[in-house]
Amino acid sequence: MLQPKKTKFRRQQKGRMKGEAQRGNQLAFGSFGIKSLENKWITGRQIEAARIAVTRYMQRQGQVWVRIFPDKPITKKPAEVRMGKGKGNPEGFVAPVTPGRLIFEIEGVPFDIAKEALRLAAQKLPVTTKFVVRRDYDMQNQNA
């Protein structure tokens, strides 16, 4: 499961996600990717499930980049405990994702395989996504 090796603080405030992604919104490594269209928290397990779905469909061809990392700690109080008495214990980590943020990138496979692989990955994620292609990608000459 994805999580930071060490954090400065064990607990963090929930915060508020507003606006679109200012960074991580351009394809940097691959020719294809999926981009988030809404604000959501994505857990490390969801990221890993999506990554496995992509690599299995691509049959270990090409390369996959995960552009988000769950570094925000989430706390939870035990069951049947009254409100108050401090913040709960850390339960796991999430990656806050805003609209426009790239989640996965792929390189080294043909267009149709990349599109289907990323569609399978998108089904594992709690956000609505959009398939994106590099602007200078040559659709006629698909030399993957």
UniProtKB/Swiss-Prot annotation:
One of its GO terms (cellular component) is cytosolic large ribosomal subunit. One of its GO terms (biological process) is translation. Keywords: Ribonucleoprotein, Ribosomal protein, RNA-binding, rRNA-binding, tRNA-binding. Signal peptide: none annotated. InterPro entries: Ribosomal_uL16, Ribosomal_uL16_bact-type, Ribosomal_uL16_CS, Ribosomal_uL16_dom, Ribosomal_uL16_sf. Residues 1-22 are annotated as: Disordered. GO terms for molecular function: rRNA binding; structural constituent of ribosome; tRNA binding. It holds the Pfam family Ribosomal_L16. The keyword rRNA-binding applies. It comes from the Bacteria. Residues 1-16 have a biased composition (Basic residues). Belongs to the universal ribosomal protein uL16 family. Binds 23S rRNA and is also seen to make contacts with the A and possibly P site tRNAs. Part of the 50S ribosomal subunit. HAMAP family: Ribosomal_uL16. This is Large ribosomal subunit protein uL16. The lineage of its organism: Bacteria, Pseudomonadati, Bacteroidota, Bacteroidia, Bacteroidales.
